[in-house]
Amino acid sequence: MVNFNQFLKQAQSMQKKMQEAQEQMANTRYTGKAGGMLVEIIITGKGEIEKVSIDESLLKIEEKEILEDLIKVAFNDAKQKCDEDSQNSLSGALNGMSLPPGFKIPF
């Protein structure tokens, strides 16, 4: 039979590690780039856009669709990096236990 006090200590330790991982993620920035760095987006660990940089060559009406696509690609690039880091941080906090598919840190 598992010692309940030991189980409780492990759960508290895991909870503390998860909180630390969430705080670290919230303070981390992720950069997504598209079009050979014509568009760059920086997001927070919470997935919020912090900065958008657009090369002046794209600021023409005839480049509108290209710019829209590049913004989408840059954001998705940054978000993917954030999601991967989030999964790695959470997995580390859980002492290497595997996570169910689609499970994410609750931000």
Swiss-Prot record:
This is Nucleoid-associated protein RT0857. Keywords: Cytoplasm, DNA-binding. Homodimer. Binds to DNA and alters its conformation. May be involved in regulation of gene expression, nucleoid organization and DNA protection. The lineage of its organism: Bacteria, Pseudomonadati, Pseudomonadota, Alphaproteobacteria, Rickettsiales. It comes from Rickettsia typhi (strain ATCC VR-144 / Wilmington). Coiled coil: none annotated. InterPro entries: YbaB-like_sf (IPR036894), YbaB/EbfC (IPR004401). PANTHER family: NUCLEOID-ASSOCIATED PROTEIN YBAB.
